[in-house]
Amino acid sequence: MCESYSRSLLRVSVAQICQALGWDSVQLSACHLLTDVLQRYLQQLGRGCHRYSELYGRTDPILDDVGEAFQLMGVNLHELEDYIHNIEPVTFPHQIPSFPVSKNNVLQFPQPGSKDAEERKDYIPDYLPPIVSSQEEEEEEQVPTDGGTSAEAMQVPLEEDDEMEEEEVINDENFLGKRPLDSPEVEEMPSMKRPRLLSTKGDSLDVVLLEAREPLSSINPQKTPPVLSPVRVQDRADLAPPSPQPPMLAPFAKSQLPIAKPLETKSFTPKTKTKASSPGQKTKSPKAALSPARLGSPIRSPKTIPKEKKSPGRSKSPKSPKSPKIVAHVPQTPVRPETPNRTPSAMVVEKTVKETIPVMKPTQTPPEVVKLNIEMQPKKPVVTDKTIDDSIDAVIARACAEREPDPFEFSSGSESEGDTFTSPKRISGSECATPKASTSSNNFTKSLATPLPLSSGTSSSDNSWTMDASIDEVVRKAKLGAPSNMPPTFPYISSPSISPPTPEPLHKGYEEKAKLPSSVDVKKKLKKELKTKLKKKEKQRDRERERERNKERSKEKDKMREREKEKEAGKELKYPWRELMKDEDSDPYKFKIKEFEDIDAAKVRLKDGIVRREREKHKDKKKDRERSKREKDKRERERLKEKNREDKIKAPPTQLVLPPKEMALPLFSPSAVRVPAMLPAFSPMLPEKLFEEKEKPKEKERKKDKKEKKKKKEKEKEKEKKEREREKERREREKREKEKEKHKHEKIKVEPVIPAPSPVIPRLTLRVGAGQDKIVISKVVPAPEAKPAPSLNRPKTPPPAPVPIPVRVSPTPLQPPLLTQAAVCPALMPSPAPALSGIGSAKAPVRSVVTETVSTYVIRDEWGNQIWICPGCNKPDDGSPMIGCDDCDDWYHWPCVGIMAAPPEEMQWFCPKCANKIKKDKKHKKRKHRAH
């Protein structure tokens, strides 16, 4: 009543405005369109005002909110003011009652002298109504049938439904003739109440499940167009009360109702919906059973919806001339029983279930429908989950895209949705593309212009078309002989773009819906499915966790096995160097890589061993300790071997004998002196002792004692060798010193004393061996000035080289490969070559030559000072901390080698080049050892 009344008033207003502008007459089609536009315009204006008032924290809008709403709609307030002043005011044709309209007091507050007032407890405030008596409760229970707040209230007796359908068919046809001009919205306007029906329709069930909507009536009661036929009016009267049940619930009931009829005759199922689609569509083919979206105008199929709402059993749906057949089946409509199940609470439950599991959608279908749905569910439940989610995402995305506010674009679909602005163009494009499927889905989402709405028409349980479904539909169409896809003929004159093509036939959807089980069964099944899904997920999680645990266990087992193997190998090896030869993985990095590879292989194999792990954990710890000790021992032994070899090589070359005065001087020049002759043998032993002290577990003291004894023996042997070598060196030195004294006396007599070397004196550098060493020939200052203090400690910043030192020669490695093997690099030690050159230079009366073997990265400046160059950055020593390689004696800046803090003194450090060479040498040794 409200819709028809408001629309009639708007029509009068349109006529008055036209008269004021000078028009004498108006075509009915134009009048209907203008009325529809005015209605939408006022609705959007009201929405804008309300939203602005809420935005600023007000419950009631004020003029400022109205002004903001006008601006949002593109209306200039100044122009509007001028228009009002320049045009005579149009009086309203009817007197409008002042709101709120006076009503009888239904609260029944007790009068002061009544019994209720006397019996009323003191603690009950006066503003609370009295407790309802049992009689009143009984009366109230009867009210819902009239109120239509629940699905039951909306239902009509089956007998009436049959009659209603016949009447509706007639009315629709008549209506087409009578009001071809009604804009789709006019029919759609009832969508306020009908949107629920649409959603409830089997076709729209999926959509409904996907997105919950508020009934259009609750949003815009005025929006629905006046009832076109008496039957519809009655339906509206029934539907008018539709309480704000969750839109989802109502749609389910609706869907079930239409399904009940199709159950009896699947071929007719489309009929119910075809009528709703449009008068043209209704006549065309019940087979086309347009999805609720199709029903009514493309934007919204409100007419169809209200029709369906009129008969919850859907008996009323006169969607096609064949609807009388449906009427025959109407008595079957067990839809009513379903509708009672859809009380607000039940509907809410269904709504939640549907949201969680789209397959459950048909919960509210009638028993017959339930059966059909039961058949259909096993096929489509899986598909629906994914497809529904995808469709929902698509719908949401499209809705977001379409929600750009455009004050001038109006769409009934958007109004039903509650979207203030949606352009008709959008509606026409998307809705036409998805023939009215979006309209059916409008109850849930305006943007349901995606293929989902269409699919919803085809099957509520299926959101996506399958090959089988499409084939079945084609066959059905052929049997029915009615083109389901015939374009609907719209008598309405609405925006031409809005008239949508008829959607694909809903036959399959109806059949599937009919197959759906009863709401109770469906709920149970849904709950079971949810539980099973949750259980499956939990099982999967547990499995994944177990797999991860197994992987970790397998890794630990692999590590344990490797450690055990290493222990066994260590026990079998009598000599440490053999152990080194056999261990290809002496490099800790390589060892780690192997562990990971083994672990990867073992992950697949090992799944047991929880008990073993606990036992092996302790073993692992012990093995790790033993490993580290073994590796350290191996390294130390290698170093000792290399040192011994170097010493042997160094010993044979003859050394110059220094005079007794200079006996205290080190054998090597300060640049080359990193470690005194006695130190190389002992230096490697220090780290061993330190590491041993740190890692001594009580259990392994015995093993350590044995190792220490072996080490002591080796040390003693080395000491003896060194002492012998020293004695030889001393003898040679004495001989050389004697010769040097003779030469020096001659030089002193001939040469004047030179206070400092002149920068002009040329220097010669000769490369020796593999380019590691250079022979630097420079001028020598007289002996008296040469008494520099020997520097035994390696400086972090290389020390300046003292210039005046008599000719000194010390052994250097004979073969460049040995340099890489040596634990202590002899690279900076003077080479034997200088001895000869020194002797030869003694003959020269003026100058003597000092030869020193200097690293390629050490330079002497004009005054003879040594400057270290970092091989990493090729920049000289700038005072920043540097670290020297224990093999080649090249000095690197810390940042160039990635060192942040100084390493411990006991620990040897090798540059990248030397480290690689040592690794290669170790491998080579191992190969040789194996060959033997």
From Swiss-Prot:
Pfam families: Bromo_TP, PHD. The keyword Repeat does not apply. The modification Phosphothreonine is found at residue 502. Residues 130-201, 213-347, 403-465, 480-579, 607-657, 681-746 are annotated as: Disordered. It is found in: Nucleus. Gene3D superfamilies: Histone, subunit A, Zinc/RING finger domain, C3HC4 (zinc finger). GO terms for biological process: maintenance of protein location in nucleus; mRNA transcription by RNA polymerase II; negative regulation of signal transduction by p53 class mediator; negative regulation of transcription by RNA polymerase II; positive regulation of transcription initiation by RNA polymerase II; regulation of transcription by RNA polymerase II; RNA polymerase II preinitiation complex assembly; transcription by RNA polymerase II. The modification N6-acetyllysine is found at residues 266, 779. Keywords: Acetylation, Isopeptide bond, Metal-binding, Nucleus, Phosphoprotein, Transcription, Transcription regulation, Ubl conjugation, Zinc, Zinc-finger. Coiled coil: none annotated. Transmembrane segments: none annotated. The modification Phosphoserine is found at residues 183, 199, 229, 243, 291, 297, 301, 669, 758. Residues 158-171 have a biased composition (Acidic residues). The TFIID basal transcription factor complex plays a major role in the initiation of RNA polymerase II (Pol II)-dependent transcription. TFIID recognizes and binds promoters with or without a TATA box via its subunit TBP, a TATA-box-binding protein, and promotes assembly of the pre-initiation complex (PIC). The TFIID complex consists of TBP and TBP-associated factors (TAFs), including TAF1, TAF2, TAF3, TAF4, TAF5, TAF6, TAF7, TAF8, TAF9, TAF10, TAF11, TAF12 and TAF13. The TFIID complex structure can be divided into 3 modules TFIID-A, TFIID-B, and TFIID-C. This is Transcription initiation factor TFIID subunit 3. The lineage of its organism: Eukaryota, Metazoa, Chordata, Craniata, Vertebrata. The gene is Taf3.
